[in-house]
Amino acid sequence: LRVVRNGIGIEQLFSVDISGLLGLWSLTVAQPASCDSRAMDIDTDDARLVLLVLSLVDRTLLLGWREPSGEQVDVAEVALSGWRLGEPTLAAGLASDRRHVVQATSSAIVLIDSVGWTVQAEWVPGEIGMSAISAVSVSGDQVAAAIDGRTIVYLEVRQGALACVGHRQLDNVVSCIDVHSWHGVAGPATHVAVGMWSVNDVCLLALPDLVTAAPALSLRMSQGLALPASAINLASTGQDSLPRSVLMCTLGNTPYLLAGLGDGRLHQFALSVDADGVSVREHKSIALGSGPLGLTPFVNHGSLNVFASSDHSAVLFADKHQTAH
């Protein structure tokens, strides 16, 4: 694991050997919070607390430090109450107030208050008669999850609680899910994007009712067609090309639906999003690696970029009304 800070250049803060790493999330908590450390003390002044949430095969590991911390970064393993550390984490993120943290595991979605690290709310699949969470996306106060493979649940953080707004069952098993907004921090997500295991599709479900937005589109559609898109076919070319990650984002001024496949290819769908729905303006596919491709949004100097991780990594950004990497 290498941790870097992006400023004038990319500065490596520290590195550590970790085996069995399944996923990681970086959270910068705005509120001052105390940490009980197993390895070393972490100051509890008003500097921002940075947490790395590491999902391992059988547990969750938290690493923390304070920002700004100068050139020396004192990283410690921390044991915080409220976190479900005895099982892997599927997703983690900050609520819009940057004080509350959402952690999702296969057994529960938990809302944690960073002041005191207490559990504020908890949602479990048993509330809708199901057993296990299989995929989750967290974006601010919005949470979308796949339950028992085929059921999509949409939750919102509301005044320190987790409200289940809606759920519906799909015909196919979900491989990946995303609830990021095309509006960034300017507004909430209006759709959930869902990738499917058994068919090479990404479908768009309108929020809050999770209704299918529109009919399916073929991958081989021509540029300039303005057809409504709810299920975007990624062509049936084998298990390796099934969608492993999906992301809704705006690069420059253009909304995109991005799908990362198991063979390292990236599908980019440039969209038009308005009151009449969603339409595809342009589609292209590029190879960024040869293994499963993950997609993570981040902000660099005020502009949204996307980190694409596979056996090779790349950064996607807007360049003269198109994407570059």
What are these regions (language model features)?
Residues L1-H325:
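Large eukaryotic, non-enzymatic subunits of multiprotein complexes that serve as scaffolds/tethers
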